[in-house]
Amino acid sequence: MEIIMIFVSGILTSISVYLVLSKSLIRIIMGTTLLTHAANLFLITMGGLKHGTVPIFEKGTSSYVDPIPQALILTAIVIAFATTAFFLVLAFRTYKELGTDNVELMKGAPEDDRE
């Protein structure tokens, strides 16, 4: 099962790199969001996809699940949600000001830098 998850994580990473390299600001934001999801999937897979009980020590239980990767992923999901929301608001404001979401057209004129 781990090998399938590694391949899925690799496919998600390649799709996200493709999106990040595009010219549309919304596609770049979705690419970074997808990249965080791919990294989260990779980390949870490396933490081990095994069956066990919660890490509360009880008599008669031999295998426990490691809670550290799960806590790390939960924190990463919250941070990714906050940054994605910020980037979307920033992209909306940029679109309202400039009238485009193409990053090639957002470049300033060389005359603006001299002042």
Swiss-Prot record:
The keyword Ion transport applies. One of its GO terms (cellular component) is plasma membrane. GO terms for molecular function: antiporter activity; monoatomic cation transmembrane transporter activity. It is a multi-pass membrane protein. GO terms for biological process: proton transmembrane transport; sodium ion transport. May form a heterooligomeric complex that consists of seven subunits: mnhA1, mnhB1, mnhC1, mnhD1, mnhE1, mnhF1 and mnhG1. This is Na(+)/H(+) antiporter subunit C1. It comes from Staphylococcus epidermidis (strain ATCC 35984 / DSM 28319 / BCRC 17069 / CCUG 31568 / BM 3577 / RP62A).
